[in-house]
UniProtKB/Swiss-Prot annotation:
This is Secreted lipase 5. The active site is at S241. InterPro entries: AB_hydrolase_fold (IPR029058), CarbesteraseB (IPR002018), Carboxylesterase_B_AS (IPR019826), Type-B_Carboxylest/Lipase (IPR050309). Its main location: secreted. The keyword Cell inner membrane does not apply. Optimum pH is 7.0. Its EC number is 3.1.1.1. It comes from Gibberella zeae (strain ATCC MYA-4620 / CBS 123657 / FGSC 9075 / NRRL 31084 / PH-1) (Wheat head blight fungus). One of its GO terms (cellular component) is extracellular region. GO terms for biological process: lipid catabolic process. Gene3D superfamilies: alpha/beta hydrolase. Residues 1-17 form the signal peptide.
Amino acid sequence: MHLKSLLLAALPLLLEASPTIKGEDTASLAINTSSGIFAPYFDRQQPNVASFLDIPYAETPIGNLRFAPPVEKKNAGDDIVHTTKLPAGCIQYLPALLRGTINDGPITAGTFQRGDYANTTEDCLKISLFAPEKSVRAKEGKKTQALPVIVWIHGGGYSVGGTNVPYQLAQNWVQRTQKHIVVQVQYRLNLLGFPNAEGLAREGNNLNLGLLDQRLAVEWVRNNIARFGGDPDRITLWGESAGGYAVDGYLFTWAQDPIIKGVIADSGNALALEGVVGDSRNHTGFSLAAKSMGCGGLLPKDELECMRHVPERNLKEYLQAEVGQGGAADDGLTVSVIADNITVFSNYTERISGNSAKYPANIPVLIGTNTNEGAAVVPYKFPGFETATELPDQLKPLADGFGLNLQCTTLKETRLRAEAGATTYQYLYAGNFTNISPLPWLGAYHTAELPLVFGTYETEGPSTKFERRMSERMQDLYLEFASDPSHGLEKSGWPRAESQPERSKLVKLAADNKVEQVFSAKKLVDECVQNGFAV
């Protein structure tokens, strides 16, 4: 898929590192980790942030490791690695149903929400780590308090995305607060991360490899973050969209050994997965791809082995092909997590209880949605789209359905968690800023809150005073939660969710020129019930 010219012009500025501005050899600040020795780079725009841009946490998943669980990366020796640009992303695939939406890049804001198609590889199981300079220097005898850690899991429908998304880079946030560390994780996507292959299923092998990648990355953080000045006992897992599903679902998968102490789920939750998990018995998608790769007509075991030897270039061409070029989009390839009742479950609603073997209700969750989620999933180029203030009637059912599903499953989960005695805080984001939502009808679309939290909201143009205030407050709120998941937001006046939805309260962000305001969930609950959603 081609990228817009503006993206091509901007990406080198964002992805390539400026020359180091520290008056020393950064090798003196190198950190010895379980997967190698890494020296930081310092950018002119964020001079007090030590950026470790390209750290592998797993072996390259090629050959026999393609379509297999990730293998921990081992320290290769004494060489110091000093990288000056972000890692190449995992191979991308934009499904047919998202072609023609803002996710397809017709406007720059939409383009900046997904990864760089031109720079992808299977050698992508990397993290990018951003820490205050002072925390990295602690090993020189300048003691600092261990910092809370936020591990970011990107969205993108398990098909696109990565670290190299300008809206989703954490340096500005860390530069401003100097009080936390952010680790951004890449994981395998689409056919390579979620291969519903019969050859795997027959042997009882896991089909949700991308989720196993995420877990291995969390283990890497636990084992290494203290060396960067981070607190391994204060790790919060944060994700949005598919990343929101992943981090919320993580609690169910790793209930007996979660490692993390808090979860932030933006516009995604485990209960919403119940309606979109794939059928573990339907292997036609993988076999169709295999046929296109010259591996058709084989027994399942042989099909899998053949696909493990397909050149990476061929896979990239197939997955990233434009419509009409005989690629995955033309084959109608769909990507979904598979309910195996090990990493993904089909009964999340039933599993939320006080039974810690099934669900760790002791881990607090901050969860929320946006007021116009569905604007991101409808065809954008309708008549008059450049000046319209709302969607045309024929597109509203699709947009409303997408948004209501997120809103109502979120309300349902907050109720179930409250019944289980779990600490839960809920937000509703309503921000509408022209440098993020340049078309009048977009509003607070799916992902629109992220530039505020990351502090990248000026990527597309200057901000307003209110937008800057909003960004700083959201950054502080997320950090308050990560610093003390049980009580941090409560100290800021946030109410905990209650077991009776009509009595529960949540916090509305960026609505009516107000930074935050507490309001009743009853109106949202009523809207769900009127549209047939159980909360």
